[in-house]
């Protein structure tokens, strides 16, 4: 995948979650709840502060993160793969 996010943006691939109903039926597609966990595929150089310095991001490529899929999240298809482009502020935690 040849993409480089700018500034404090992060490219995340959503991790698939297998959802099971109360009766034990495996739900897929639109019936399944979308995961808010993903793997970081690429990161920008960092946030530019008011004094002009760049603050590096806390996440790195390969981290599994929990994210908030809010207003600023952009869905894109790159090399046939759906990815999310979001700001570091939309990341809530690093798993593991």
From Swiss-Prot:
Keyword Cytoplasm set for record = yes
Query: Tell me, what's a Pfam family for it?
Result: Cpn10
Q: What domain of life does the UniProt record list for this protein's source?
A: Bacteria
> Which InterPro entries does the protein's record reference?
Chaperonin_GroES, Chaperonin_GroES_sf, Chaprnonin_Cpn10_CS, GroES-like_sf
Compartments annotated for it: namely:
Cytoplasm
Biological process (GO) annotations? chaperone cofactor-dependent protein refolding
Alphabetically list the UniProt keywords. Chaperone, Cytoplasm
Q: Name one GO cellular component term.
A: cytoplasm
Similarity annotation: Belongs to the GroES chaperonin family.
Assembly state and interactors?
Answer: Heptamer of 7 subunits arranged in a ring. Interacts with the chaperonin GroEL.
The UniProt entry, under HAMAP family, shows: CH10
Main localization category? cytoplasm
Record function comment: Together with the chaperonin GroEL, plays an essential role in assisting protein folding. The GroEL-GroES system forms a nano-cage that allows encapsulation of the non-native substrate proteins and provides a physical environment optimized to promote and accelerate protein folding. GroES binds to the apical surface of the GroEL ring, thereby capping the opening of the GroEL channel.
- Give GO MF terms, alphabetically: ATP binding; metal ion binding; protein folding chaperone; protein-folding chaperone binding; unfolded protein binding
Name of the featured protein: Co-chaperonin GroES
């Amino acid at each position: 995948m040849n993409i480089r996010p700018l500034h404090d943006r992060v490219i995340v691939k959503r991790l698939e979650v297998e959802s099971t109903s109360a009766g034990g039926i495996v739900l897929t597609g639109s019936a399944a709840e979308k995961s808010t966990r993903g793997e970081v595929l690429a990161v920008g150089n960092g946030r530019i502060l008011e004094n002009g310095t760049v603050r590096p991001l806390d996440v790195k490529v390969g981290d599994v993160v929990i994210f908030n899929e809010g207003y600023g999240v952009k869905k894109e298809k790159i090399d046939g793969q759906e990815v999310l482009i979001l700001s570091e502020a939309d990341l809530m935690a690093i798993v593991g």
